[in-house]
Amino acid sequence: MRLLWGLIWASCFFALSLQKPRLLLFSPSVVRIGVPLSVAVKLQDAPSGQVVRGSVFLRNPSHVNELCSPKVDFSLSSDRDFILLNVPIPQAQARICFLHLRRVPEVQLMVQSSWLRDSLSKQTDMQGVNLLFSSRRGHLFLQTDQPVYNPGQRVRYRVFALDQKMRPATDILTVTVENSQGFRVQKREVFAPFSIFQDSFLIPDISEPGTWKISARFSDSLDSNSSTQFEVKKYVLPNFEVKIIPENPYILTTPGFLSDIQVIIQARYIYGKPVQGVAYVRFGLLGEDGEKTFLRGLESQTKLVDGQCQISLQKAEFQGVLEKLNISTDDLPGLRLYVAAAVIESPGGEMEEAELTSWRFMSSPFSLDLSKTKQQLIPGVPFLLQALVRDMSGSPASSIPVKVSAKLFSGSTSKNQDFEQNTDGSGQVIVSIGVPRTISEVQLSVSAGSPYPAVGSLTVKAPLSRSSGFLSIEWQNPRPLKVGETLKLNLQAVGISGSFSYFYYMIVSRGQIVSVHREPRSHLTSISVFVDHHLVPSFHLVAFYYHGGVPVANSLRVDVQAGGCEGKLELNVDSSKAYRPGDTVKLNLKTESRALVALGAVDTALYAVGGKSHKPLDMVKVFEAMNSYDLGCGPGGGDTAPQVFKAAGLAFSDGDHRTEIRKSLSCPKESKSRKKRNVNFQKAIHEKLGQYTSPVAKRCCQDGLTRLPMARTCEQRAARVQQPACRKPFLSCCQFAESLRKKARTRGQVGLARAMELLQEEDLIEEDDIPVRSFFPENWLWKVEEVDRFSQLRLLLPDSLTTWEIHGMSLSKTTGLCVATPARLRVFREFHMHLRLPVSVRRFEQLELRPVLYNYLDSDLTVSVHVSPVEGLCLAGGGGLAQQVQVPAGSARPVGFSVVPIAAAAVSLKVVARGSFDFPVGDAISKILQVEREGALHREEMVYELNPLDPLGRTLEIPGNSDPNIIPEGDFKSFVRVTASDPLEALGSEGALSPGGLASLLRLPQGCAEQTMTLLAPTLAASRYLDKTEQWSMLPPETKDRAVDLIQKGYTRIQEFRKRDGSYGAWLHRDSSTWLTAFVLKILSLAQDQVGGSAEKLQETATWLLSQQRDDGPFHDPCPVIHREMQGGLVGSDETVALTAFVVIALHHGLAVLPDKNSEQLRRVENSISRANTFLGAKATSGLLGSHASAITAYALSLTEAPEDLRRVAHNNLMAMAKDIGDKLYWGSVTTSPSNVLSPTPAPRSPADPIPQAPAMSIETTAYGLLHLLLWEGKAELADQAASWLTRQGSFQGGFRSTQDTVVALDALSAYWIASYTAEEKGLNVTLSSLGRSGLKSHVLQLTNHQVHRLEEELQFSLGSKINVEVRGNSKGTLKVLRSYNVMDMTNTTCQDLQIEVTVMGHVEYTMEAEEDYEDYEYEDLLAGDDPEAHSRPVTPLQLFDGRRNRRRREAPKAAEERESRVQYTVCIWRTGKVGLSGMAIADITLLSGFHALRADLEKLTSLSDRYMSHFETEGPHVLLYFDSVPTSRECVGFGAVQEVPVGLVQPASAILYDYYNPEHKCSVFYGAPRKSKLLSTLCSADVCQCAEGKCPRQRRALERGQQDLEGYRMKFACYSPRVDYGFQVKVLREDSRAAFRLFETRITQVLHFTKDARATADQTRNFLVRASCRLQLEPGKEYLIMGLDGATYDLKGDPQYLLDSNSWIEEMPSERMCQSTRHRTPCAQLNSFLQEYGTQGCQV
């Protein structure tokens, strides 16, 4: 009995304990540092009148005494038992409590109240729950001005910063940019005071295609990272877009059934008009892994009608093709049908392409989504199955029958229920299934659609039975709600044995508890929730009650259709209006409140070139970002209350029950597995590629399949492949493609289907290689406007015919962020004109302008077209003469005008087209035609030291010597620069910190990695000098910003050359170089603070360098950039000293980025430097070092503070090699080859002589010597002397000879100038004067050593004139002279060592029989007139492949024109065996006028495995070809070029081959157009030719015709008009071609008159020049009377040369036999009388 009473008492006590009072604690399961935490506190089961006070706070689980937030007090009572608190979490307090030191991101939410201990008899007054914490907070949205960019373009971007509530946030942001390889190229911290940050950066022009990323985060929140991506690829905007539109979004296939396959090909111009032309369509299959197999025999060639055509595949035909591939229709579901279409428009022959890759074979036309159905049953409550049915386009499918089969289990028994219901307008169906209380499990099978349904299944179970019951949330019509609507629900307790008073519920949205509520319980408890913007885009309703001390809960997830932003932003233009280029458009901006509106306009053509995957920011993306803070997982519900709370994203504790801490910030993802299909694709090329498994081998095979633009056998090509592993697959695939091409040719033009069986071109070319064409601007309107409810902008439209999309984003303090629906406007002219001009032409070349007229009106037009008169151009009728052209409706017609430029200038061409009176249409285009002078540009530089303290140096005379090759009537210019401050000139805003950086200091290209580093190195030296001497104020205010920009550009660009292991190669495809990697490590270590680079990445670079060190200390270079043996080093076989010293210098600078002093890597680097120094010291001690190796070794040992004895030996060796000239000290060069010994620099004869300019090697060596001397003795006499010599070696631009000598010299001089800086001010007065044709010209300059004054006065004077300089003052200075003029010949070059030859041939078709190479199909050859049906022969895939690779023009000419306008360039280079190069060589080819090189050809020469060049660049009319070396035997490369605008009488152009590191070592030649080419014929009409020849001389033939000189016309010409300067009777000896001139060498037989040619006597020779475009012919052996004006040029002997022009008298002297005839006797006597009178008496006036 006692036991029984004990049990009864215990049970009663237990029941009472369940009803005990308690505190309930709710909060989001993740804490956001810096964002207030919403905490709900509830008092449960407390007696009436009870008041509980306490506080809530956060703490560190490991440091419980360290609070991570302030304490927030609360007070609860039985009447106010459920409240919501906000607990602030300041960033500073989170750091103080050491949260950042925790390995696991956990924090404790605690409630503290004495009531917990006093009333509940607990041992503590605290209760808590564990939460995760994250520093992610707020929202950052990024926007770029385009979705896709070309390499070399500038990216403009914006960052919008908002807080957790979507309101503007003014925080410090960290913005980073990553390139396509994932390397960080830019990092900066910025402050956005208006919550919008804008910036831009430049994509390097050598960037590989790929996806770049811009990321932003709040600087104090590492997890708040947000990013946007954009694509970088080579493209040109299309003129029209091709779309492939399937009739159905899927292809239905089931066993024994296949639906129809129909597709529409649509082509429209960007401005919306349909394209006329032909569509070529082919099909293939795409596997799940992206593998592509083409279906041979299904190709189609169809004419477009009104811009589109329909292609239908017959079932039998399609199934027959599948059977050939052993593919059954049963294998098709899960695969995709690939469709590729190429459209050629008939008016211009332009081609664009498109592909469709998303057309799936499906077993059902629908998809079934059951994710919104809850996973738990509530016994006795109807279960709601929610299914969403979509079609294959992803759109909701309405009115689709859905069948549901429910199998209900109760113990071992079951029963079935079947339902059928149609989906509503949103594609949703809700089926209510009655569930008796005894049911424990329901198995559901669902099918949607008929007869080929989508199916799905689901099993749901009931929780274990419990006395506390279940909470049912009834929503009669589940659907997404809209803002402003009210959610009405019923709450019901099911299966409960007792009673309770209230239901409690919470609204949770975006990871925060928005509100808490309680509702009295009734028979049917109804609650209402008003949906506002705070609940967008979804929220959770979490309801609970307590019964018997046990919480019972349920939840519901509700999606909200926002429909738009919280505020309002509308962009309105009058879209119904027809806009034309240059029109003003009114853009209306409407907002709900005052806001900043960020605008941008982008050409919609960008979305056609690959930008579709990077669409602009819209509200969908904004809502996705907002919803990313939702911590809930699933549709709601759970087996227990803690599970319900956890699934809704809440943490919960009541002292007895609590939620488990969540495992991660995101929801667990369902693991999905899918069986991969294995379809046997049998195809010739695929089988070939399938032989190789590695990506490298596949790439080599792909390269072998690609045809070169020049004749090479496969064996010759394979011999150039450097990697042995690549050579075999390359050769095999090359031979395979060669055999296919042979078959294609020998079989002739087979049908299209059979041709496709021979070769599938897509297997040879990546789709990314397909270029797209246009010349349109790509974006504009990048601005931020402040708008207060309404604003109207008046915008001027660009001159493009396209469709613009205007984007707008507003930021308001009251309504947050809003992204407007883009406004589109079409810019179009029904009648418009298109005109192309060449990059440049030369004087007296003839070109044909061919404006194309487009008529999109419904009526034919008669149009009058003319070219406006302009000075310097010869035009038909003098300009203004119009041509009448008939342009039919809906067509295009070209009009031809011949033009001859006769003046070297930038000429503004204006073409005007006007309609008739009945059709007042018109258009006008104005473009600049760049007209260059004949010949090639030649430059001369001289440097003088200005020293007024030396009496002999106070007066200088700069001679005016003349070059015999100078172009007559040229532009003779001398630029003079004077400075009294060498540091500020070299390092200031006009030198290393000029807008172009070192690029402006050197006339060298900027392609490879080492050239890229020159953007960084000099700028760092300049910044260091200006920082140390505090002289930034001496320069323009923007100079500091420019320096930062230059450093950032260099850093961004060099990352494109970085390899995964941290090393660097000269090119992207080149193996890593030790020397270059060391160079990068040194410069980036110095730039680390300014570029925000990754120290870890530089540590990887240092580690790679250590791996290149040998055991005995020296470093080796597996792939040298510079052949150091040619630049010093050791005499003998050891060439590693200079390299080892260079790496030591780099590693020393790299110590700054290594970890702390005790790190293993630091010890390894220090040990490496020590071993290398031991090696260097031993070599220095041997005494065999050359001057360069001695200088860099001495500097390396001094820099690293090597042992004293080693440093002293190196110093003594270096000084023993020094040379001195007066007060200057320098080091020359001793090389390994006696033939390469550079002669010592001669000493100047006097202070007034120009300073001799040393080679690059001497400059670099002296710079290292100066760096060593500064460390050895500081600023002392020796350093002064070396710096003085080095300063005077600078070029006119401020640089030196090449990159390395410039980089090292500026580094050394900046260090010297820092050491020698003085604030003392000194003055320098300079007077420059010269006597020219216009008289004496003088300039007076007053300079100081702290002022940069640059004079670039164009002193244009007759050659032979001199410049006198007078110097006064007490400061030294420098005077530099640059002469610039054009020359006719290249005889003064050094082509004895290096050789280059350029030949140009008319369009060449290589055939296997003739050239043992591949035939050259031209895609443009397919075009035969404007009628697409004229294509009588089908297009083979080989033509598509080869033609696409060659297509590079905007408007493809017809086949006949193509053969005339395309030429083949062959560039051959070689050197004599005794001459070496320092390293890289560059061929600079100036193309013939009007031509541009085919990039596709050049890319093949650089990108394939059989690489022929390292790199190429195109700039204007120049093509730069980079070669690693110049061979001793002749080696040639070839590429095609196309002349876009017809040019006649094309003049020769120049080509230069030079040593990059020693540019004076060069060979320069001229080359001309192919013989018998139309390029050499005339294009002009009669009056235009007459105008062009207006300056040409004409031979006088009056005597030949027997005309008598009754009026003395010879004497009038000689003495009155034009009154000549000379008169000679000469005999022509020979004729010679000189560029654009012809030279006649003559011997004087009689001197009649002279002015300045005082040395002219009989039997002397004189040269006469005439333009090659003139028709004058002087025959050798004949005598002529020649009179005219004096020339401005001189021959090699210093005698004047004469230009024959319209002011020249040229008359053939008659023979004695002619003068004996009766007809000519009197005229001959009159001629002899003139010769006698004029020769003895001259002019009598």
Curated annotation (Swiss-Prot):
Q: Does the keyword Secreted apply?
A: yes
Disulfide bridge map: 68-97, 633-667, 700-726, 701-733, 714-734, 1468-1532, 1580-1585, 1592-1670, 1615-1739, 1715-1724
The alphabetized UniProt keywords are: Cleavage on pair of basic residues, Complement pathway, Disulfide bond, Glycoprotein, Immunity, Inflammatory response, Innate immunity, Phosphoprotein, Secreted, Signal, Sulfation, Thioester bond
According to the UniProt record, list the residues that bear Phosphoserine.
Answer: 916
Q: Which GO terms describe its biological process?
A: complement activation; complement activation, classical pathway; inflammatory response; innate immune response
- Region forming the signal peptide: 1-19
Parts forming coiled coils: none
Q: Which residues are glycosylated?
A: 60, 225, 326, 1241, 1325, 1388
Q: Which residues of this protein are annotated with the site description Cleavage?
A: 754-755
GO CC terms, sorted: axon; dendrite; extracellular space; synapse
Sites of the Isoglutamyl cysteine thioester (Cys-Gln) crosslink: 1008-1011
- Which Pfam family, any one of them, does this sequence belong to? NTR
Q: Which residues carry this modification: Sulfotyrosine?
A: 1414, 1417, 1419
Modification comment: Prior to secretion, the single-chain precursor is enzymatically cleaved by plasminogen (PLG) to yield non-identical chains alpha, beta and gamma. During activation of the complement systems, the alpha chain is cleaved into C4a and C4b by different proteases depending on the complement pathway: C4b stays linked to the beta and gamma chains, while C4a is released in the plasma. The alpha chain is cleaved by C1S to generate C4a and C4b following activation by the classical complement system. N- and O-glycosylated. O-glycosylated with a core 1 or possibly core 8 glycan.
InterPro entries in UniProt: A-macroglobulin_rcpt-bd, A-macroglobulin_rcpt-bd_sf, A2M/Complement_sys, Alpha-macroglob_thiol-ester_cl, Alpha-macroglobulin_TED, Anaphylatoxin/fibulin, Anaphylatoxin_comp_syst, Anaphylatoxn_comp_syst_dom
Q: Where does the protein end up?
A: Secreted
Q: Report domain NTR positions.
A: 1592-1739
Domain Anaphylatoxin-like per the UniProt entry, residue ranges: 700-734
SMART domains listed in its UniProt record: A2M_recep, ANATO, C345C, Thiol-ester_cl
Which residues form the pro-region? 674-677, 1447-1450
Q: What's the miscellaneous note? A: C4 is a major histocompatibility complex class-III protein.
Q: Which PANTHER family has this protein been placed in? A: COMPLEMENT C4-A-RELATED, MACROGLOBULIN / COMPLEMENT
Described function: Precursor of non-enzymatic components of the classical, lectin and GZMK complement pathways, which consist in a cascade of proteins that leads to phagocytosis and breakdown of pathogens and signaling that strengthens the adaptive immune system.
Q: How does it assemble?
A: In absence of complement activation, circulates in blood as a disulfide-linked trimer of an alpha, beta and gamma chain.
Q: What is this protein called?
A: Complement C4
| Native source species | Bos taurus
